């Protein structure tokens, strides 16, 4: 985002991750747990007031809504992500570690001309360009832990439990 001229706002689930983003150059970071967002009142009912609070917190940092939201957790945060995107903005979904049966208020999508797109990283040309950024030292990939092939189950469980940063 920084290399593309954008203003990133990182929304994370711990102070450790907030510090990691700051070390990587992200000036605007919100720790969901510190702010105690409760996007769900119960397992069936989302809390739009909490979405509004997140949007207000984002606007207090950068003065506007965000153009693009990279949505990773899935069920637990998707409604808030749809709400937080600016009019005409995009929500890019690239995973669903908190659940893949997604719910959101569609009025916040269609009434504000937002779109949802999916991504599974990149096509070959985009992957080459991303690798070139690494080779040129413009971005630093984050690898928090490595696993052997025999530890695939353990690795998947660590992702599910939100214990991994980066890839």
Predicted feature locations:
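Glycine/Thr-rich phosphate-binding loops of Rossmann-like dinucleotide-binding domains
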Residues: 39, 78-79, 101-102
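Rossmann-fold dehydrogenase core element
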Residues: 87-94, 104-143
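Active-site loop of short-chain dehydrogenase/reductase
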Residues: 65, 87-91, 165
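C-terminal hydrophobic helical "lid"/dimerization subdomain
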Residues: 79, 124-167
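Short beta->alpha linker loops
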Residues: 12-16, 33, 72-73, 97, ...
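Short, glycine/polar-rich helix-capping loops at beta-to-alpha or helix-loop-helix junctions
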Residues: 13-23, 100-106, 127
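Adenosine-nucleotide cofactor-binding segment
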Residues: 3-76
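Conserved helix-to-beta-strand junction in the class I
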Residues: 83-85
